[in-house]
Every structure is written in C-alpha cells, then in structure tokens.
C-alpha cells in the first residue's frame, strides 16, 4: 500500500482522486471506481502497490505498437483494478477482481506476487527485455507503481 500522488483532500474526510478522468470523490473507508484506491482516515492510498497480479515476458509484437524494438521481448506487468468496465475484457478476472463485493482491503494488498520496482528491473534485465510494458489492465490505475518502476528503469538504461 502506498499513498496516492494525485488526489485532493476535501471537507468531512472526503478525498478527490485525480488519477483518472472519473475524479472519484471517495468517503472514508470507501474505494473509487477502480476498486484499488481507498480513503483511509482522509488520505488516499493505492492498495496493491508492489503486488504484480501479472508479470510475463511477451513478444513486443503483442503490444499495440508499430515497429517498436521489433523482434524483442518486453517485461509486462499489471496489478488488480481498472477504471473501465469493458464488456469483452479478456483480463476481467484481474481487472475487476477488486470490485467483487466480498473483496477485502487485505485481499487487494496481497493479490499477486510481491514484486518491487527494483525486482522488476532485475527480472527485465535478466530476461533480456529492453522494455517494460504496463498492461493487461488500465495502467493509469497503478500510476505510483509504474512511475517508481519507470524512474529505476531509466537509471538502469
């Protein structure tokens, strides 16, 4: 769990999430539309920080990019949660998991594999992946996790 970087504190313990275009106003002990940002005592937290629900090595051609590092592999990661509700989502079991009625904060915090940004860089390098893809769910939702990973990836080259 990590405090969100894009939110505003409002009156009466409410917070306004500014991570995506839904701009959820979230009451204490409630979550936004993504299901992974929760108001805890007047602060907004991203619950599954450091918990990759998916971590795979994919051919870059699988991604919606044109002629980007052709014939290479990318290290792909995602967390649970999504601000979309696409009717034919192929990853609905991970994107919508946090919205199931009986999903608790602890379940979200412990979902997936404990994978720090540093470990992601190490695994990408070990597997000769010159890129990291933030994918499978809407990556804006895991902004803090992705951003911390990006900063380390840039330093690592």
Where are these regions (language model features)?
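Short clusters of hydrophobic/aromatic residues that line enzyme substrate/ligand-binding pockets
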Residues: 7, 34, 45
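Short secondary-structure capping/turn segments at boundaries of alpha-helices and beta-strands
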Residues: 6, 21-23, 62-65
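Conserved Radical SAM active-site core
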Residues: 39-157
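Short, ordered beta-strand-loop transition motifs
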Residues: 9-12, 28, 70
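Local cysteine-cluster metal-coordination motifs and their immediate loop/turn environment
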Residues: 15-37, 80-92
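Iron-sulfur (Fe-S) cluster-binding modules
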Residues: 1-19
